[in-house]
């Protein structure tokens, strides 16, 4: 199973790299990449959730690991709808395949709305397990932030996931982040005042 996941990841990311080499370095048709590393510091547990995204015009490609389940890889293809004036939006419906500890498929949606320094970001999916309907699950990660400066933002966050367990079905928290050039660092603190508080540190780079 690990060999199958590794081969899938190699060809998915390798294909994106080949396309990137063929694309011009600048201009409206160039590839844009975004790599994330999400570090979960949970009581008596720790894991990393990496995400890689590639966009070219309307095309959106994405790869995730440890998202739907531990030791599980998912690959996605989607279509970007972008526009707006005062209210800017990016809406990306997607379809993904999931292999690893969990095997299935998932329709998904990513939404980003920007208005006068406020941003709502939400990513959701309905995981459909190939083995049993009892494993079907609705995932969601949503952040609402305000940026007083281009390099600084803070806000609230909510997650619904199965990769870790707490007493709450929906993890709720606060966040603060900062950026420098193409790098971003965001720290989340979830479930303050409840039984299972934990910290998430997210590092991302655009290139």
Regions found by a protein language model. Name each.
Residues 1-29, 207:
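Cleavable N-terminal export/targeting peptides
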Residues 73-97:
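Glycine/small-residue-rich loop that forms an oxyanion/phosphate-binding "nest" at active or ligand-binding sites
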Residues 46-51:
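N-terminal Sec/ER secretory leader and immediately downstream segment
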Residues 62-63:
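N-terminal carbohydrate-binding/catalytic regions of secreted carbohydrate-active enzymes
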Residues 27, 31-34, 39, 43-45, ...:
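Outer-membrane beta-barrel transmembrane domain signature
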């Amino acid at each position: 199973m690990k060999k199958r996941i590794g081969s899938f990841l190699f060809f998915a990311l390798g294909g994106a790299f080949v396309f990137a080499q063929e694309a011009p370095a600048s201009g409206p048709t160039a590839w844009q990449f975004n790599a994330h590393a999400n570090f979960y510091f949970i009581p008596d547990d720790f894991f990393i959730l990496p995400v890689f995204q590639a966009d070219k015009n309307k095309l959106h490609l994405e790869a995730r690991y440890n998202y739907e389940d531990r030791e599980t890889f998912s690959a996605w293809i989607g279509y970007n709808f972008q526009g707006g004036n005062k209210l800017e939006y990016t809406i990306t419906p997607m379809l993904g395949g999931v292999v690893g500890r969990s095997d299935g498929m998932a329709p998904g949606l990513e939404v980003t709305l920007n208005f006068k320094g406020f941003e709502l970001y939400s990513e959701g999916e309905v995981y459909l397990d190939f083995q049993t309907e009892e494993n079907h699950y609705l995932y969601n990660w949503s952040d609402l932030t305000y940026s007083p400066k281009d390099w600084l933002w803070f806000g609230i966050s909510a997650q619904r996931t199965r990769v870790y367990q707490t007493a709450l079905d929906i993890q709720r928290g606060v966040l603060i982040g900062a950026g420098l050039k193409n790098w971003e660092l965001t720290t989340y603190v979830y479930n303050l005042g409840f039984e299972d508080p934990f910290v998430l540190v997210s590092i991302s780079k655009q290139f």
